[in-house]
Regions:
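C-terminal domain-tail junction helix/linker
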Residues: 215-264
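RNase H-like two-metal-ion nuclease catalytic core shared by retroviral integrases
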Residues: 168-170, 175-177, 190-213, 220-232
């Protein structure tokens, strides 16, 4: 009986070629059933009918969806990689960050962090994420110095000229944070020691990046083009907070408006 019932699970998807092709493609691109369903609910894809997340899950578990079942990302408990911290002079803590930043009212207020190589590897990855649009910018740093961090940040500023403020942790690589503020023309706010949740947006993005750069990876062995591909994947997620637009679409929309956007 179970076998008979399973045969008809996901029938709505199976019988609609356009819908099935879209669902299969997006699952293979690591989109979640929630994201796919939400995207269709907001009519972001022309000519493709809406399907609920429950129907997508049933389809995946059916005999028709078996071949792509492995494409669904399994959420894993993430361990926080600790880097050396210490006393940094002249910091402005997150307590003094303007309330408008806390409310995600404008583009340009970012959080930034490092992803580090596994044991025996070298190199780090600078990750900068816009708090409002969730769009991420990645720059690998192969020789880890304060100067290299500043250079990587300036490369991101060229691609993300809207960058106005940044919230980060107390890594000693930010020892010359005042200098970095002048170079980037931004203000930097620091989280309290061991309060990683105060920069939750970039922490969540790091988790998405880890799908493509698992724990233990050696960043020095990855090319810049690899990180551009990862960046594109991360910025192609359908996000509920963006009304199921992708971060790339949201950024393009804001830039097209040619004004400071207050709402998506």
């Amino acid at each position: 009986m179970r076998r008979y019932y399973a045969k008809y699970q996901g029938k709505k998807i199976v019988e609609d070629k356009a819908l099935r092709a879209f669902v299969d493609t997006q699952l293979l691109l690591d989109q979640s059933p929630e994201g796919i369903s939400g995207r269709l609910k907001y009519k972001r894809e022309k000519g493709i009918q809406y399907i609920s997340k429950e129907s997508i899950y049933r389809y995946i578990k059916s005999i028709h969806g078996r071949r792509i079942e492995a494409a669904l990302r399994k959420k894993k408990k993430r361990r926080t990689t600790k880097r050396t911290t210490g006393t940094l002079d002249g910091r402005t803590f997150i307590d003094k960050r303007p309330s408008s930043i806390n409310k995600r009212m404008r583009i340009g207020d970012a959080e930034f962090d490092f992803i580090v190589s596994g044991k025996g590897g070298s190199g780090i990855l600078l990750v900068v994420v816009d708090r409002k649009l969730r769009v991420a910018f990645l720059e690998p740093i192969y020789k880890v110095t304060i100067e290299a961090v500043h250079t990587a940040a300036k490369k991101i500023k060229q691609r993300y000229p809207e960058w106005r403020t940044g919230t980060t942790d107390n890594d000693l690589l930010f020892a010359r944070h005042k200098e970095l503020e002048r170079e980037l023309l931004i203000r930097i706010f620091f989280c309290h020691q061991y309060h990683s949740w105060e920069k939750g947006t970039v922490e969540n993005t790091n988790g998405e990046i880890r799908v493509y750069l698992p724990k233990g990876s050696d960043i020095s062995l990855k090319t810049p083009s690899f990180f551009r591909t990862v960046e594109k994947r991360v910025n192609s997620r359908f996000m509920e907070c963006l009304e199921y637009r992708t971060p790339d679409e949201a950024l393009h929309r804001c830039r097209k408006q040619k004004r400071s956007p207050r709402a998506l």
